[in-house]
């Protein structure tokens, strides 16, 4: 039985005070409060700047055992197996056992490039839970992409959005879903996540963060629906 991890794609939105967070809660206490209600977060800030070991350690110290951080690879890493990737791989161990998947996102203008994907996958440690979120539709049509991901044990993020859906491709260790709709079928998703966890893989589901407190409340509602399963902790 795998474990189900549920969260949002950020945790420090000021507009969540007075709803998800108590009014007046200092920003430095937001993560600890968040982790008391959800067991994972997809970190959006690392897309724009490289995380530091000290920053990652500080995050890890604020959350309980069993919590997971899904880290977005910085934009400058892209699909390039160079110095930025090496730096990212060097700092990630600072999270210790709180490290979950690492999400690599390609920009909407980047067409499918199986060669670039293969070069990056060749540089990733097999133990890393690598997940890819391809924004150009050509990646879904390129047959080599799924083959390369499966060979490397990497996953493709599933997408449930108003613009359409992308089916998740499980990795060797996890299944990853990004729930981008403001309204999604909570009961249906809970059943789906439980069924996937029963296959033995860890399952991650992240609700899109919004400026208001609705998104974390939707994540909590999904977690409560899933909580009847022993896979959620």
Indicate residue ranges for each PLM-predicted region:
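Residues lining hydrophobic/aromatic ligand-binding pockets adjacent to catalytic sites
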Residues: 1-233
């Amino acid at each position: 039985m795998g474990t189900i991890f549920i969260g949002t794609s950020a945790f420090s939105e000021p507009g969540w005070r007075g709803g998800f967070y108590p009014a007046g809660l200092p920003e430095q206490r937001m993560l600890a409060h968040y982790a008391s209600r959800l067991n994972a977060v997809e970190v959006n800030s690392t897309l724009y700047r490289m995380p530091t070991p000290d920053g990652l350690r500080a995050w890890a110290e604020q959350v309980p055992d069993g919590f997971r951080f899904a880290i977005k690879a910085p934009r400058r890493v892209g699909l390039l197996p160079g110095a930025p990737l090496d730096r990212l791989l060097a700092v990630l161990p600072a999270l210790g056992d709180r490290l979950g998947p690492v999400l690599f996102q390609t920009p909407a203008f980047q067409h499918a490039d199986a060669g670039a994907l293969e070069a990056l996958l060749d540089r990733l440690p097999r133990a890393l839970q690598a997940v890819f979120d391809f924004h150009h539709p050509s990646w879904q049509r390129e047959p080599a992409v799924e083959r390369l991901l499966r060979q490397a044990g990497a996953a493709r993020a599933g997408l449930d959005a108003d613009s359409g859906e992308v089916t998740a491709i499980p990795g060797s260790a996890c299944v990853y879903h990004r729930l981008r709709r403001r309204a999604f079928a909570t009961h249906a998703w809970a059943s789906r996540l439980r069924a996937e966890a029963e296959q033995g893989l860890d399952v991650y589901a992240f609700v899109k963060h919004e400026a208001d407190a609705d998104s974390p409340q939707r994540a909590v509602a999904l977690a409560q629906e899933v909580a009847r399963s022993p896979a959620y902790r």
